[in-house]
């Protein structure tokens, strides 16, 4: 009798654990819906310069982070301000990637753009580009109190663009023995 009762209890616990874990996991269809929604962020700074495979990895990281915090899909879907929540996860994931590897700055300031702007010479090899991005990331880390503050400055502050350009020019000068000329225009009312 005890064996039957013990077997029944163990079976009930095991089945409830399996039942709960299935209920808490998102389906492939639900994950795919969120991946499609993340496509709307493709033109956002940093994401627009990712290769397709890099973007798929990035969106997978965002989906995973959301799924961990909202294990029940319906809870996530019914969130008021769900779009804002997704945007917070997108920005947080970008910041995490920048913290993890400063070379990821190449996605915000791609090499062809820096050549076009006259910051870097054309034809740099991968090693020289990496040295530039490492120098630039060190200057950014010294100047901004956090990666989030840096990202906010890049996205929304036009005054920071000049500061960032100056940092880029300083790194280019340090690495390639270029002279720097900084023109500053002061407008007096």
Predicted feature residues:
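Sec-dependent N-terminal signal peptides
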Residues: 4-13
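C-terminal motif of bacterial Sec signal peptides marking the signal peptidase cleavage site
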Residues: 16-19
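Bacterial signal peptide processing site
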Residues: 21-23
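Post-signal-peptide N-terminal segment of Sec-exported extracytoplasmic proteins
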Residues: 38-73
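Membrane-interface starts of transmembrane alpha-helices
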Residues: 47, 51-59, 91, 125-133, ...
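Short, charged early-sequence alpha-helical segments and their helix-coil boundaries
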Residues: 72-94, 149-159, 163
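Extended amphipathic alpha-helical interaction segments
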Residues: 92-134, 141-144, 176-184
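C-terminal amphipathic alpha-helix
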Residues: 147-189
